[in-house]
C-alpha cells in the first residue's frame, strides 16, 4: 500500500472515530424536555410564574449535578393555556408531538388539566399536577394511568374545610358558593360527602359563572337559609367578586375557601376584606424552615431580583409543589433509565424516598395512589398586608 493510501485510510479512520465520538457526545448532551402548560397571562398569571420558578429551580439543581441519563440536561418548555381548556389541549399536543417532552406539568385550572389528562393517557406521556386539585385528575379511571400529582386533592380538602369551619368558627350550617365548572362540581361532590359523614345538612348550594360580577342574589339566598359560614370554591377573579358582593350586602360571615384566592391578584381585586378569607395551602415560606426550605429561599433570592424574602415568594404553593414535583419526576426518569413514557410512569412507583421541600416523602406513589400529598400536609392561610401568611402568624 502506498504512503498516500495509508495516509488516506488513517485520515478516514480518524474522521470516522471522531464522528462516532461526536455523535455519542451529542446524544448524551441532548436535553430532556419538561413541558409546562399553565396560565401565564390574565388574572392567574402569578400562579403560572410561581410554578415556572419552582420547576426551574429544581431543574437547575438537577443540571448542576450532571443532569440525567448520562449527562443529559433538563430543559423547561412553557406554553400559556390562558386558563382555557381548549387552548390547554392545543398547547399540550404541541409539547407532546413537536417538543417530545418526557413529562408534562399542568397548572392552576382543574378544567384545563382534566381536558389534558385523556391526551396524556392516550399518548403515554406522564403528567404531573403541581396545582389543580380536581379529584378526577388523578382518579380518572384509566389503566394504565399516567397522571400524578404533588398538590392538594379536592375530596381531602373538602373534609379539611369542614373540619376547619367547625373548629375555628363553630359552624353548624355552612353554605356553598361554587364556580360552575368541573372544579366546582368536584368540590360540591366532596363537600356533600364530608357533610354527610358528619350528619350535617348544608344551608344551600349556590353556583356562579367564572365571569360573573355580582353574586348578591346567590349569597342572599344562602343568608336567608341561615348559613353561618361559607365554603368558597373559585379562582382569583370570581373569588374576589364573592368578597365584594358580601361587602355590598354588609354580611359579615366566615369564609372558608379552597386555595383559588392564592393564585393571583386577589387582594387587589377583592379589596380590604380579602384578609377575612381563610384558605388552604400546602406550604408557607414564613416561619421556621427546614434545611431544604432555607436553601430554596436562598436560591430564589439569588436567581430572581424581585424576590427579597418570603413575602415575595408568592403564591408559595406553586413554587413548592412544582419544586417537589420536578424532583420526583427527575427521580422517576432516573429509575426508568430512559424517557420512555411507560418506563417513567413505572419509575414513579419505584421512588422509595425523597427529602423534599414540603415534606420527606416515603413511597409517594403507588399503582393505587397517584397523589403524593395528604391532609397532614395542608396549612391554613390568609392575606395579611398583601402577603399570604399562615393563619395567626403576623410577622416574618
Describe every region a protein language model picked out.
Residues 22-25:
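N-terminal signal peptide c-region/cleavage motif recognized by signal peptidases
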Amino acid at each position: 500500500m502506498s504512503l498516500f493510501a495509508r495516509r488516506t485510510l488513517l485520515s478516514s479512520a480518524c474522521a470516522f472515530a471522531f464522528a462516532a465520538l461526536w455523535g455519542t457526545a451529542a446524544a448524551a448532551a441532548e436535553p430532556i424536555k419538561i413541558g409546562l402548560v399553565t396560565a401565564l397571562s390574565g388574572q392567574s398569571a402569578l400562579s403560572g410564574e410561581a410554578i415556572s420558578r419552582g420547576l426551574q429551580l429544581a431543574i437547575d439543581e438537577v443540571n448542576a449535578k450532571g443532569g440525567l441519563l448520562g449527562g443529559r440536561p433538563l430543559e423547561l418548555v412553557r406554553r400559556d393555556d390562558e386558563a382555557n381548556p381548549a387552548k390547554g389541549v392545543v398547547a399540550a399536543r404541541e409539547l407532546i408531538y413537536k417538543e417530545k417532552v418526557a413529562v408534562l406539568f399542568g397548572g392552576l385550572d382543574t378544567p384545563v388539566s382534566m381536558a389534558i389528562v385523556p391526551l396524556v393517557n392516550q399518548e403515554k406521556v406522564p403528567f404531573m399536577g403541581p396545582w389543580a386539585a380536581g379529584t378526577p385528575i388523578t382518579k380518572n379511571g384509566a389503566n394504565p394511568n399516567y397522571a400524578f400529582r404533588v398538590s392538594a386533592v379536592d375530596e381531602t380538602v373538602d373534609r379539611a374545610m369542614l373540619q376547619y369551619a367547625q373548629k375555628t368558627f363553630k359552624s353548624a350550617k355552612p353554605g356553598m358558593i361554587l364556580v360552575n365548572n368541573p372544579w366546582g362540581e368536584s368540590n360540591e361532590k366532596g363537600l356533600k360527602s364530608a357533610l354527610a359523614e358528619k350528619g350535617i345538612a348544608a344551608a344551600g348550594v349556590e353556583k356562579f359563572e367564572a365571569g360573573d360580577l355580582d353574586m348578591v342574589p346567590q349569597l342572599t339566598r344562602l343568608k336567608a337559609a341561615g348559613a353561618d359560614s361559607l365554603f368558597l370554591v373559585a379562582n382569583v377573579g370570581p373569588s374576589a367578586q364573592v368578597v365584594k358582593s358580601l361587602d355590598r350586602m354588609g354580611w359579615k360571615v366566615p369564609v372558608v375557601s379552597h386555595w383559588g384566592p392564592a393564585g393571583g391578584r386577589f387582594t387587589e381585586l377583592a379589596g380590604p376584606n380579602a384578609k377575612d378569607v381563610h384558605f388552604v395551602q400546602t406550604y408557607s415560606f414564613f416561619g421556621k424552615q427546614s434545611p431544604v426550605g432555607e436553601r430554596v429561599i436562598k436560591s430564589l433570592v439569588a436567581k430572581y431580583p424581585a424576590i427579597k424574602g418570603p413575602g415575595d415568594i408568592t403564591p408559595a404553593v406553586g413554587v413548592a409543589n412544582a419544586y417537589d414535583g420536578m424532583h420526583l419526576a427527575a427521580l422517576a426518569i432516573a429509575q426508568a433509565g430512559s424517557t420512555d413514557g411507560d418506563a417513567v410512569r413505572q419509575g414513579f412507583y419505584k421512588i422509595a424516598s425523597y427529602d423534599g421541600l414540603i415534606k420527606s416523602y416515603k413511597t409517594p406513589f403507588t399503582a393505587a395512589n397517584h397523589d403524593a400529598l395528604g391532609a397532614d400536609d395542608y396549612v391554613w392561610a390568609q392575606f395579611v398586608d398583601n402577603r399570604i401568611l399562615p393563619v395567626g402568624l403576623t410577622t416574618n
